[in-house]
Amino acid sequence: MRGLNNIAVALALSAIWSFGLDLGRHGTSGSSLLLALFRTLCKAYPFVVISHFVWSAIIWPTFFSPLRQLPNVPSDGWLSKETLRLVSEPRGVPQSDWINSLSNRPVDLARYRSFLGFERLLIISPKALAEVLTTKSYDFRKPGLIVSELKQATGMGVLLAEGSEHKSQRKALQTAFNYRHIKNLYPVFWDVAGEFATVLEKQIPTGTPRTSDTTAVIDIVDWASRATLDIIGRAGMGQGFDAIQNDDSRLHQAYRMIFEPSRGAIFLALLRLIFPERLVNWLPLRRNKRMRHGIQVIRSKCQELIRERKEKIKRQKAGVDNSGNDILTVALLNGVFTDEQLIDQLMTFLAAGHETTATALTWAIYILCKQPEVQNRLREEIRMHFPNPKGWPRSERPSSNTLQQAIDFKLPYLNVVCLEVMRYFAPIPLTMREATCDTTILHTFVPAGTRIILAPRVTNRDSALWGPDANNFNPDRWLSPKNGNREATEQSKFKIGNQKRDSTAAPEVTQEEVRGRTEARSNYADLTFLHGPRSCIGQSFARVEFAILLATLIANFEFQIEDESLLDERNISISRGATSRIVGGLKVRVRPIAVV
């Protein structure tokens, strides 16, 4: 990349020379000086942008990059129709097809070029992933452009922090996400899920027996977002947001404005490739105005939560236990964060904590509509153990431990369906890192500034890791028959809230029993929550939340896709934002299941 530095120096000298000429023509008064400087910058900036593009997108990857010797995808080369798929198809889909079509498998790394020609290094093998995510995790950071995109909605919390700052923040927050604490949240998850089912049932016309074919059509994308927002509020912040009961909830409407894909969002993203972030955010565009309003609503709510929790802690200090373990209480009692940093942490968990799980729940309902036999089998298992699937009155509700045992150990098919949904429909299909220094990955030299692609959509459907049916939705891949006996298979246990063994909680199950015939031979074969120091801190929370929401919905309702053309996934429009959110919603027909 030294050549790029030389170009920058040459352009700077050219700008200084141009500035001197302007100064000579217009004099040295204050106004003339500013005018000459402005003119010089306006003249130089396009040349800087164009020169940077020519070097980074054409000269460097074509003639100088040390990564040229790696396997290149697609096989047709950069200037081909295949490259157009990077902007016309959902993120990660083209890369997944390219990797699975390679003849010389397995490979550790592959190189491709973006639509504009910029070089990308795709991390493929478990060994390469382990080095990037664990061994050298802090050698790779989120690029500035991605940080500027995300921080508007998430704040500069643990998700975007880097280096020592990230280590400090993660350590301070870890207590709130220990599985020991997550176990105590099962009843909270179940209560919100039961409320969700009750409100959905009210959407169905009354006046006929519930055993009839009375149905209603709902947008599961919107409802899933409302449910997960209420869960993160109650379980993470100690306060519900009334999103399930009230479609006009200010917080829900704010996130709808922020996450709803639009042409304006795409246009602003393109502008950020060329112009400084502050300039783009300052532009008087409708999208910017909506973003500013939404963020203001969210920040105000976070300030309110912090203020109320501080007052509650003060009241409790007089001889009352105040050792709450929700995210906000842990962060406050730790004393590490300022109020502004606390707002950033709450914004991080509100945005990342509800949008990703809502996306997973949406895709789960979709695939169960597409495979009704899986939906029916799952419903049968759930109702066998939960005859009153909308929950219990508080006076009759089982203990946290009883609920945890039931969800984790008595519902094996629920567990594997959830695992397969997270594998097949990774909510975040692709993320990017940038090498902060000259480094190596499996002895391959990687220059500073190289863009690294970590793609759950690619890894989770890699046929070299998951077998020839990697691109099929098959929950049974996680189950392993014993002597061909399917009943024995159903006894396989996999604790969805925690992947660590607890020998006192259930019979020991080997990894082979869990993984099945097409077992994923490495933990790094499943990239949904990443791995290592930068893995998702809230993955246990998300897994349990997702499982309980899905169990409640499937136990209470039968789902069908309203528009049958969408049963072909290629007809579904998917956001090109951070998550694989379905654009325009997903209409499903809901029929209540009678309680027997």
From Swiss-Prot:
SUPFAM superfamilies tied to this protein: Cytochrome P450
Alphabetized CDD domains for the sequence: CYP_FUM15-like
Cofactors (names): heme
Region (Disordered): 476-512
Localization in the cell: Endoplasmic reticulum
This protein's pathway: Secondary metabolite biosynthesis
This protein's UniProt keywords: Endoplasmic reticulum, Heme, Iron, Metal-binding, Monooxygenase, Oxidoreductase
Gene3D superfamilies: Cytochrome P450
Deletion consequences: Increases the production of fumonisin B1. Causes growth inhibition in both solid and liquid media. Increases the production of ceramide intermediates including 3-ketosphinganine, sphinganine and phytosphingosine in comparison to the control.
GO BP of this protein: fumonisin biosynthetic process
Bias-annotated ranges (Basic and acidic residues): 484-503
Expression triggers: Induced by fumonisin B1.
Top-level EC class: oxidoreductase
Record-listed heme binding positions: C536
PANTHER family assigned: CYTOCHROME P450, P450, PUTATIVE (EUROFUNG)-RELATED
Function in brief: Cytochrome P450 monooxygenase; part of the gene cluster that mediates the biosynthesis of fumonisins B1 (FB1), B2 (FB2), B3 (FB3), and B4 (FB4), which are carcinogenic mycotoxins. Also plays a role in self-protection from FB1 toxicity, probably through derivatization of FB1, and may contribute to ceramide biosynthesis.
Name recorded for this polypeptide: Cytochrome P450 monooxygenase FUM15
Gene: FUM15
